């Protein structure tokens, strides 16, 4: 966390905008008047960036897709639940977290559809915040690992890369496809001036774009 806070402080000095491409939090759910305990310094740093005139956008990832009005109204973050196409530094960019893209992992796709459904969100909101937050944190907890990427991460990386290359081929107006989710950084020039980039992760690689 301290390294991330130092990086945010540096960002405040030199960035014109900041886009966080999902899974900033291991678990996030906003009840009507309660948010998960913790993340205080990170949230304060993000609010500080916004107060200094640096726009902050956050793409919901598979761990923190349930963002809402606390992030947007109290912190000032623009929260996005779905992929977007935007002009970034002269590049027409497709920006997505990356979960659910590519072939395979049918079980996760089904779970993702259920978890993102309105009924699931409503039902989860009926749980007591202490129980709901503990349950969500337990299910979505990211384990710190030693060594290289796991087989599952390599599989996700391959699937998302294959999807991204196909998307660049399908839409010639795109210059850049940016994803996360896989935890494996990657920069690939598909053809002159057109790229697929995976920002990797902060926990293991301290990587960013």
Regions found by a protein language model. Give the residues of each.
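Core catalytic region of metal-dependent phosphoesterases/phosphodiesterases
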Residues: 1-88
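Conserved beta-sheet core of the metallophosphoesterase superfamily
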Residues: 74-82, 92-94, 99, 103-111, ...
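N-terminal short leaders/motifs
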Residues: 27-48, 143-177
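Active-site-proximal loop/helix segment associated with metal-binding centers of metalloenzymes
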Residues: 98-160
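Long, contiguous hydrophobic alpha-helical segments, chiefly transmembrane helices and signal peptides
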Residues: 21-25, 128, 208
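Short, surface-exposed, polar/charged, turn-prone segments marking secondary-structure boundaries
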Residues: 12-15, 46-49, 84-88, 108, ...
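Short low-complexity stretches enriched in small and charged residues
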Residues: 11-16, 47-56, 130-135, 151-153, ...
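A broad, low-specificity signal for short, low-complexity segments enriched in glycine/proline
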Residues: 17-20, 41-42, 52-59, 136-140, ...
